[in-house]
Structures are given as structure tokens and as C-alpha cells.
């Protein structure tokens, strides 16, 4: 599946809720989902009945778009989760949550996951003191994630960290906003992740 390059806000409206793809705009009154809470297009306000398969597909697309991964990547995460010991749906979300680009976003090193991914790719993020520029890199409990010295003066990073601090950092990280450094205290459990995601229907979709 090709990468989507259209307006991000249309994806949020298509999925019927905020996917937090546009940084601070998503938390403001200017968010299109708050203004027009219906699907885009001529017939967007007339949502038809959705079949069981259609509902499963929509939830899969929603999760995939939130974390910004392509279909092939998403399926590989599911296969890995289904082969591991534990609850498949929860493991799937955990693998996505522990991607380096998502961790960078959770720490405020990017205003959105797309921006955090760019920060990672540009080599501005260190893991245990070593530069890592792979967005899909899996962070582990005990890892220390920080901003490289040369990037600590970037205004956008500083502003994003401040905004994220105001909303609160995840319980599974210990963040030092002065040093722009965080320790991963533990892997996130289901209660630490978005409560409005229904990962079980994705498991059912891929299990057919």
C-alpha cells in the first residue's frame, strides 16, 4: 500500500476521530474534526451501515494511521505479536508504542509522530548515548532516549517538549525536561495506551 500524501485532517474525519497527526493543531479549536465531525466528501454526513468486516477494516486503518506505518509493516507487527507469548492485541499495540519515532513523540521531541519520525531520521535522537536514525527501532525497558547535543537548541523541539510536559508524559517513562532525556522505566501495558482503540477486532480481521 502506497504512502498517503493528502491532507492529514481528512484521515481523522474519515476514521471518525482525532488521530493526532497535526501536532498542536489537534489540541486546538481549529481541529477540523471538532468543527466537522463527519467523513469528508459530498456524502460524508450520510454514514451508511458498516458490516462486521468493514468495522474491522476501519479499526485496523485507524491504528495503522495513528502510528504512521504502512500495511506491510503493520502486518509484520501482527505476525510477530501472534507468535509471541501473551495477548496478541496488546502485544501488537506495545510493539507500535515502542517504536523509536513513537517514543520520541511521547517525549515531546516532535509535535506529531511524523515530525518525531523526521527528527529520528535526521539523527537527532540518541539511545543509550548512541545515535539511532531508524524510526522503527524497538526501544526496551531501561533504555535512555535523549536529544543529541547539537539539536537541543532547536526551538521546535523545546516548544514541543514544553507543550507535552503540560499534558503529561506517559507513566512508563521518567523524563528530564532540562536535559531532554528520558529513561524507559517499563514497557507500556494496555492501560497505558489509548483506551479508544479496539485491537481485538484487528486480531479477528487477520485471523480470518
From Swiss-Prot:
<dbReference type="InterPro" id="IPR001912">
    <property type="entry name" value="Ribosomal_uS4_N"/>
</dbReference>
<comment type="similarity">
    <text>Belongs to the universal ribosomal protein uS4 family.</text>
</comment>
<protein>
    <recommendedName>
        <fullName>Small ribosomal subunit protein uS4</fullName>
    </recommendedName>
</protein>
<dbReference type="GO" id="GO:0015935">
    <property type="term" value="C:small ribosomal subunit"/>
</dbReference>
<feature type="domain" description="S4 RNA-binding">
    <location>
        <begin position="98"/>
        <end position="159"/>
    </location>
</feature>
<keyword id="KW-0699">rRNA-binding</keyword>
<dbReference type="GO" id="GO:0019843">
    <property type="term" value="F:rRNA binding"/>
</dbReference>
<keyword id="KW-0694">RNA-binding</keyword>
<dbReference type="InterPro" id="IPR022801">
    <property type="entry name" value="Ribosomal_uS4"/>
</dbReference>
<dbReference type="InterPro" id="IPR002942">
    <property type="entry name" value="S4_RNA-bd"/>
</dbReference>
<comment type="function">
    <text>One of the primary rRNA binding proteins, it binds directly to 16S rRNA where it nucleates assembly of the body of the 30S subunit.</text>
</comment>
<keyword id="KW-0689">Ribosomal protein</keyword>
<dbReference type="GO" id="GO:0003735">
    <property type="term" value="F:structural constituent of ribosome"/>
</dbReference>
<dbReference type="GO" id="GO:0042274">
    <property type="term" value="P:ribosomal small subunit biogenesis"/>
</dbReference>
<comment type="function">
    <text>With S5 and S12 plays an important role in translational accuracy.</text>
</comment>
<dbReference type="GO" id="GO:0006412">
    <property type="term" value="P:translation"/>
</dbReference>
<keyword id="KW-0687">Ribonucleoprotein</keyword>
<dbReference type="InterPro" id="IPR005709">
    <property type="entry name" value="Ribosomal_uS4_bac-type"/>
</dbReference>
<dbReference type="Pfam" id="PF00163">
    <property type="entry name" value="Ribosomal_S4"/>
</dbReference>
<comment type="subunit">
    <text>Part of the 30S ribosomal subunit. Contacts protein S5. The interaction surface between S4 and S5 is involved in control of translational fidelity.</text>
</comment>
<dbReference type="Pfam" id="PF01479">
    <property type="entry name" value="S4"/>
</dbReference>
<dbReference type="InterPro" id="IPR036986">
    <property type="entry name" value="S4_RNA-bd_sf"/>
</dbReference>
Amino acid at each position: 500500500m502506497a504512502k498517503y500524501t493528502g491532507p492529514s485532517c481528512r484521515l481523522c474525519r474519515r476514521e471518525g476521530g482525532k488521530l493526532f497527526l497535526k501536532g498542536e493543531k489537534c489540541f486546538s479549536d481549529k481541529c477540523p474534526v471538532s468543527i466537522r465531525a463527519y467523513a469528508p466528501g459530498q456524502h460524508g454526513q450520510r454514514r451508511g451501515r458498516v458490516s462486521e468486516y468493514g468495522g474491522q477494516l476501519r479499526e485496523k486503518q485507524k491504528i495503522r494511521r495513528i502510528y504512521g506505518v504502512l500495511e506491510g509493516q503493520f502486518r509484520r507487527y501482527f505476525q510477530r505479536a501472534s507468535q509471541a507469548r501473551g495477548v496478541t492485541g496488546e502485544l501488537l499495540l506495545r510493539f507500535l508504542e515502542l517504536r523509536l519515532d513513537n517514543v520520541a513523540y511521547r517525549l515531546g521531541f516532535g509535535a506529531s509522530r511524523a515530525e518525531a519520525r523526521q527528527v529520528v531520521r535526521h539523527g537527532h535522537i540518541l539511545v543509550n548515548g548512541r545515535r539511532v536514525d531508524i524510526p522503527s527501532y524497538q526501544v526496551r525497558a531501561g533504555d535512555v532516549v535523549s536529544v543529541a547535543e547539537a539539536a537541543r537548541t532547536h526551538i521546535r523541539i523545546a516548544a514541543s517538549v514544553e507543550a507535552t510536559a503540560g499534558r503529561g508524559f506517559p507513566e512508563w517513562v521518567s523524563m528530564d525536561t532540562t536535559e531532554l532525556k528520558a529513561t524507559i522505566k517499563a514497557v507500556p501495558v494496555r492501560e497505558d495506551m489509548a483506551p479508544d482503540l479496539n485491537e481485538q477486532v484487528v486480531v479477528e480481521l487477520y485471523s480470518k
